[in-house]
Swiss-Prot record:
Organism of this sequence: Chlamydia caviae (strain ATCC VR-813 / DSM 19441 / 03DC25 / GPIC) (Chlamydophila caviae)
Domain of life: Bacteria
Function: Protein S19 forms a complex with S13 that binds strongly to the 16S ribosomal RNA.
One cellular-component annotation, GO: small ribosomal subunit
Disulfide pairings: none
Membrane-spanning parts: none
Lineage: Bacteria, Pseudomonadati, Chlamydiota, Chlamydiia, Chlamydiales
Sections of the chain in a coiled coil: none
Protein name per its UniProtKB record: Small ribosomal subunit protein uS19
A molecular-function term among this protein's GO annotations: rRNA binding
GO BP, one annotated term: translation
Length: 88
């Protein structure tokens, strides 16, 4: 079930605060975050985030097509190793 439109998108308070501060200073340094649940908003376009995947931080550069998705969607947590090939 999706989030109610009445509530608006969820973005962690500390994360949006950092983005707004960087927009005012016109800085584009990477923002390190553990908040995979935060939704990408239009004011985040052009910023680089380092999103934690449970083991390490993966770099995510936000573009226009990512708006409306969550940060965690671009930082996979599982590694798929192919199924073994049967010889014979």
């Amino acid at each position: 079930m999706s989030r109610s439109l009445r509530k608006g998108p969820f973005v962690d308070h500390h994360l949006i605060k950092k983005v707004r501060a960087m927009n005012l200073l016109e800085k584009k340094s990477p923002i390190k975050t553990w908040s995979r649940r935060s939704m990408i908003t239009p004011e985040m376009i052009g910023h680089t985030f380092e999103v934690h995947n449970g083991k390490k931080f993966l770099t995510v550069f936000v573009s226009e097509t990512m708006v409306g998705h969550k940060l965690g969607e671009f930082s996979p947590t599982r590694i798929f190793k192919s199924h073994p090939v049967k010889k014979g």
